[in-house]
Curated annotation (Swiss-Prot):
GO terms for cellular component: cytosolic large ribosomal subunit. Binds directly to 23S ribosomal RNA and is necessary for the in vitro assembly process of the 50S ribosomal subunit. It is not involved in the protein synthesizing functions of that subunit. GO terms for molecular function: rRNA binding; structural constituent of ribosome. Gene3D superfamilies: 6.10.160.10, Ribosomal protein L20 (1.10.1900.20). CDD domains: Ribosomal_L20. This is Large ribosomal subunit protein bL20. One of its GO terms (biological process) is translation. Keywords: Ribonucleoprotein, Ribosomal protein, RNA-binding, rRNA-binding. InterPro entries: Ribosomal_bL20, RIBOSOMAL_L20_CS, Ribosomal_protein_bL20_C. Belongs to the bacterial ribosomal protein bL20 family.
């Protein structure tokens, strides 16, 4: 009885891994074992970084809002607190976009918030 080695299924899986390793350098795209490790590591990085991307973008939005608000004499904390008290519900992404693209509109928003901010 001949030895069963997987045949079609193994070949299909190997081809799948090697196609995922396209664009890699040298043995990382040619040798199955090396390519499998490289692809596994790449998938780990992409999984991790999809989550980090969300944190990084939120941090960027907060930085942009803070920089824009300071031009109008407030801090980020005061501004966010004032927004809540003024019942203005804009998320940080939208606020950062307004601050980045249209500083005049953002200035009007800050002026609406200022009466609700406690004098420090």
């Amino acid at each position: 009885m001949p030895r069963a080695k997987g045949g079609f299924k193994t070949r299909r899986y190997h081809k799948k891994i090697l196609s995922m390793a396209k664009g890699y350098y040298s043995g990382r795209r040619r040798c199955y074992k090396v390519a499998a490790k490289a692809v596994e590591k790449a998938l780990e990085h992409s999984y991790r970084d999809r989550r980090l991307k969300k944190r990084d973008l939120r941090s960027l939005w907060i930085t942009r809002i803070n920089a824009a608000v300071r031009m109008f004499g407030l801090t980020y904390n005061q501004f966010i607190d004032g927004l809540k008290k003024a019942n203005i519900s804009l998320n940080r992404k939208a606020l950062a976009d307004i601050a980045y693209n249209d500083i005049n509109v953002f200035g009007e928003l800050v002026e609406k918030v200022k009466p609700f901010v406690k004098a420090a």
